Amino acid sequence: MDWNNYLSEEKCPSPPNAHLGVLEGEVWGHWDLSQVPKGTKILSLPTPLKRTKLSYSNWNALRNNDEIEAIKLGYIDEERIDVLSSLPNLKYLQIHCNSQDNIPDLFPLKTLQVLVLAYITRIDNIEFLKRLSNLKTLYICDLNHLYDFSPIAELSGLQELFLSNGGMSGVGKPVKSMEPLSRLLELEYLHFGVTVENRNYDISSLLHLKRLKHLSILPRFLKKGNEEKLKEMLPLLNW
């Protein structure tokens, strides 16, 4: 699969909700990972229910697998990152978990292009994203305690960014600032579904994003002439 422009070309099963749905060809249900069928490109490894007393075994059976392009996980730790870092063609990773208090550094995943984070309700920082130099698409949904997303500013090659921390209950807690966005000069797609503390609706950080083609943002940021300013300063923008 071509993972480029994953959000803008609506390649996810339930656009724009990249954390929902089943990817075409997705394989799951193999607790013994040595039994994953040959030819598997998309592997789903959800966390089993406690009452089933099931767990995954033989993680090392995945090591150096050159066919797997995408993995969905319900839990991630350093051991799993070590195995995933050996997959030469891993382009997509989804982490959906509400039981982890922290996530280890993802830097070893050097080939990663698309990262989807959802329902990670206990984590309050995203330092683990730093140095993902090849990342093109970052999707963050329902990181309820996210306040400072400045580590995103280091993802200089990022082309697509989806930020939402409210879920079904609204827009969630405000973030510290929009300023980190100003350094994402390659950004072409932006969904900014969060508010900024102190009701700060200054959109000047967005005016640096000259490559931006798609923008979805809360209406409150478009008042008092801001919408007109965006149209004037961002010529490629297609509302």
Question: Model features per residue range: what roles?
Answer:
Residues D2-P104, P108-W239:
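Concave beta-strand-loop units of leucine-rich repeat
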